[in-house]
């Protein structure tokens, strides 16, 4: 089966992940930021930004998983999530400093 997108960003908007998040750290705001960035760049047909209710990484949130790389990123805010977007789509340097390091 051929997948319809080249890159998929899954952003946790679950209650536990976002319970202590403030300001630009909330999952919904991160999702909105990346959706707007994606639209501005005209990548909507090949890059998809989605909200998910739980990635089961609540203590490390806000979190995002990117496919097809399979990398999970943690402790994000809007600026760092945008840096991850740019890195994963080839427009910026890799961000290993934001990768989930394990439990």
Question: For each predicted feature, which ranges?
Answer:
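Local cysteine-cluster metal-coordination motifs and their immediate loop/turn environment
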Residues: 7-23, 50-67
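Amphipathic alpha-helical interface surfaces
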Residues: 26-30, 34, 50, 54, ...
């Amino acid at each position: 089966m051929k997948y319809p997108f080249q890159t998929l960003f899954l952003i946790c908007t679950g209650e536990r992940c976002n319970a202590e998040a403030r300001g630009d750290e909330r999952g919904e705001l991160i999702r909105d930021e990346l959706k707007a960035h994606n639209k501005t760049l005209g990548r909507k047909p090949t890059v998809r930004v989605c909200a998910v209710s739980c990635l089961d990484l609540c203590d490390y949130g806000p979190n995002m998983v990117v496919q097809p790389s399979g990398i999970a990123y943690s402790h994000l805010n809007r600026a760092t999530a945008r840096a991850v977007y740019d890195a994963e789509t080839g427009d910026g340097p890799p961000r290993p400093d934001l990768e989930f390091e394990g439990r």
